[in-house]
Amino acid sequence: MAGSPEPKSMREQFWDPIAGFGVTFRTMFKKVVTEQYPFDKYPTAPRFHGRHQLNRWPDGLEKCVGCELCAWACPADAIYVEGASNSDDPDGGERFSPGERYGRVYQINYLRCILCGLCIEACPTRALTMTNEYELADDNRADLIYEKSDLLAPLLPGMEQPPHPMRLGDDEGAYYRGEFAAPAPTAPGSSTEAGA
């Protein structure tokens, strides 16, 4: 037949497997160049795109103003934001950010997120950034939908848990223009801490 290959000779049938094993044996004793990932973790690049983080102002107020631009920019539709109004009303008013609004509900679905960073570019207040944390695997799908409490940056010394009034300026413009100094740490039981 015109299309069938010629049968291999006994010599070719003998040497072909030995040549293949020769490649295996030659590389078996060379130095390993792969990273042994679960056991040896190497640092990521400084601008690595990992898990998201919602940032805070130096007094502890949230930078997110609930504008939903990050959700609109997301090509994977992985971000859900619900905004609400801040209030300085003495009768039960709460302030979570210096702006008129804040992100009451903030969710990122890491089952859908492609870690592209378009949400970071869209954020007008630099409230959303990406950390170097990349181990997001989980055995439960529900745990991969991160809520606002999972995404908020931790409180540093001198910060106060919102809701509380603006401490760094008289209006939101002072926050956005950077016309403030870092707040002094409050002593336990002080009037500013008790009033919050």
From Swiss-Prot:
It catalyses: a quinone + NADH + 5 H(+)(in) = a quinol + NAD(+) + 4 H(+)(out). The keyword Amino-acid biosynthesis does not apply. Its EC number is 7.1.1.-. It comes from the Bacteria. It is found in: Cell membrane. Keywords: 4Fe-4S, Cell membrane, Iron, Iron-sulfur, Membrane, Metal-binding, NAD, Quinone, Repeat, Translocase, Ubiquinone. GO terms for cellular component: plasma membrane. Its cofactor is [4Fe-4S] cluster. It is a peripheral membrane protein. [4Fe-4S] cluster 1 binds at residues 64, 67, 70, 123. InterPro entries: 4Fe4S_Fe-S-bd (IPR017896), 4Fe4S_Fe_S_CS (IPR017900), NADH_quinone_OxRdtase_chainI (IPR010226). One of its GO terms (biological process) is aerobic respiration. Gene3D superfamilies: 3.30.70.3270. Residues 54-84, 104-133 form the 4Fe-4S ferredoxin-type domain. NDH-1 shuttles electrons from NADH, via FMN and iron-sulfur (Fe-S) centers, to quinones in the respiratory chain. The immediate electron acceptor for the enzyme in this species is believed to be ubiquinone. Couples the redox reaction to proton translocation (for every two electrons transferred, four hydrogen ions are translocated across the cytoplasmic membrane), and thus conserves the redox energy in a proton gradient. NDH-1 is composed of 14 different subunits. Subunits NuoA, H, J, K, L, M, N constitute the membrane sector of the complex. Belongs to the complex I 23 kDa subunit family. This is NADH-quinone oxidoreductase subunit I. It comes from Nocardioides sp. (strain ATCC BAA-499 / JS614). The gene is nuoI.
